[in-house]
Amino acid sequence: MKIVLTDAQTVVDNLVPADRLSQFGEVVQYGLLTYDEVAEKIADADMVICNKTRLDEDSLKLAKNLKYIGLFATGYNNIDIEYCRKHGITVCNAGSYSTNAVAQHTFALILEHYSKVREYAKFVADGQWKRSKTFSPFVYPLNELAGKTIGIVGFGSIGSAVAKIAQAFEMKVLAYNRSEKQADGVEFVSFDELLERSDIVTVHCPLNSDSDKMFGKEQFAKMKNNALFVNTARGGVMVENDLYNALQNDEIGGAAVDTLVVEPMEEDCILMQAKNCIITPHIAWAPVETRERLMNIVADNIGSFINGTPKNVVS
């Protein structure tokens, strides 16, 4: 059994190795194959494990022995599902592994905006506290989360976890979800009402035809002029130029995003020039414990497939 990892470096490192997969066969790891390299490298594979590698007809057609594709991810829009169905290739994903991590990072971004940890740490590192006339210099204004209204767009497992943390901060929680849901202490409202009432708008929906470019000029204009926009979902849910303009024109108070439309970030990404904008490099999901959990799910999926009882099947 030959198992090929096509973009191992997106998950694997010295803290989270892939050695637990070797119980199932020979494991060949490639750090990050280009699209043009994939077809040749997986030609004799029985299984392919990937994260974001594009696996379409052209990259799969040489892999005559391929019976299984495992994903280091929940989303599978990089896989040609129809081709896999036609050729008897089982595709399994990994879900619900990053709920706590993404909720945690969401609040790391929110707290950075309101508590100014980065700015005050630099203030001290630059020696300015030593020169301060007071023990507590009010250089950057701070704000409490208690009493603020957070609006959660997408109320799946991550949105629900964010709501629970918000409640611990004594925040008012609004939520918008396309399907009807209920949760204690959460007021479900329309999308427009959420935009208009929220001090913080945080996005936790999948990227699909409904959510693509969901946040653009019109939506930012409906938000409070001191509101914080947070995106730890997918870059495609927002129009980056419109977010830039909303920030520059003081239509909203700030933005904190972990995902962009193009990743890694392009040299000329306009949000790098935006004011009051915090950007992290798509790492909300990536704590060591989270990647360990993901690796275990992927290994369990492989074992279940080999035993004839596949789980987490998407095709």
Where are these regions (language model features)?
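N-terminal glycine-/charge-rich "phosphate-binding" loop or analogous flexible N-terminal tail
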Residues: 1-45
